[in-house]
Amino acid sequence: MSVAGPKREESPMTSYKVGYLIGSLATKSINRKLALALTKLAPPSLEFTEISFRELPLYSYDYDSDYPPVARAFKDAVSAVDALLFVTPEYNRSIPGGLKNAIDWASRPYGTNSFTHKPSAVAVDQIRTADS
């Protein structure tokens, strides 16, 4: 038995805005190359835009009542897309600190989470070691 969610009415011309966040801050990151390759493989109905978090200061709840302009612009960019793609390396069995910081900015203050009801996917580049 298959359980399907509610169907979304789509016209043949429907397009979706997909924001992507690159977990590595390195300018020559393989994750950046992967993200660009994925955008080229996507159907024309998907419009991709990178949402950079490079300039975000470290998050603190002290900012919740007065967001810096760069953080407000980041939060607004996340809110403006229909879906998100995280293309990230795995550092120490987790996500990079910069990406964690970006997630904190977009999800705060309480009650204003920019990720709410937003489909997302994660592409992870893992550092693997082999014992010889």
What do the predicted segments below correspond to?
Residues 50-70:
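N-terminal beta-loop-helix "entrance" segment that forms/cooperates
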